[in-house]
Amino acid sequence: GIIDHLRSIEGVEAAVFFEELPENKVRVSARSKIPAIDVCKVCKQFQGGGHPMASGARVPGSLQQVKHDFLKALDHEIRNRN
């Protein structure tokens, strides 16, 4: 899918795809190319889950707010990776 295409781009270490759903929800799909970026850890902050390198969540809120909050959490994970 789209998320795998984004992840395949040279230099990309993590990719996120946001999809607006009905009833003010957003589906988030997150993928990582490297184990040091644990996207599952980020998704769990939004009541999601999955695997360290492939995870997702359905998050209540507007696309703009969910995108802002999720990318802020992912940025924190990337900056604090081991």
Could you describe each region identified by the protein language model?
Residues G1-N82:
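Gly/His-enriched, cation/cofactor- and phosphate-binding structural elements
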